[in-house]
């Protein structure tokens, strides 16, 4: 487990990878803050909200932020809107000492990486399976 703040950024079904990380960490408690951001197109896609909210209610160091990218699809949605990676970054003034896991499509993962690195996170601070199976083309 990381020894600093952990930021988990999931797009759509990428939540399943983050769920696995959380379930691995939970038995020992969250020694450092864990922030889970889950981005979906519309609020009805938030199929694990109850589980995420239960983690938040059990652990003071766990924070859950659902984000809807297309609020027009969810007229009753009163939560956060926008791109999940941007919303995650906006919550932190200093990202120089965080660990970030990102799960989503290549475009989303690389745009999140670029934004966090631009704000001071070392590139090695971010992890995603995308880096292995869809590496960024060399320029």
Question: Positions of the model-derived regions?
Answer:
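Hydrophobic alpha-helical context, especially transmembrane and signal-peptide helices
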Residues: 1-5, 73
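Conserved S-adenosyl-L-methionine
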Residues: 3-4, 24-34
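The start of beta-strands in P-loop NTPase/AAA+ ATPase cores
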Residues: 5-6, 124
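Conserved beta-strand elements of the Class I
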Residues: 6-7, 101
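Polyanionic, low-complexity intrinsically disordered segments
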Residues: 11-12
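Histidine-anchored nucleotide/phosphate-binding helix
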Residues: 15-27
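Reductase modules of NAD(P)H-dependent flavoproteins
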Residues: 33-139
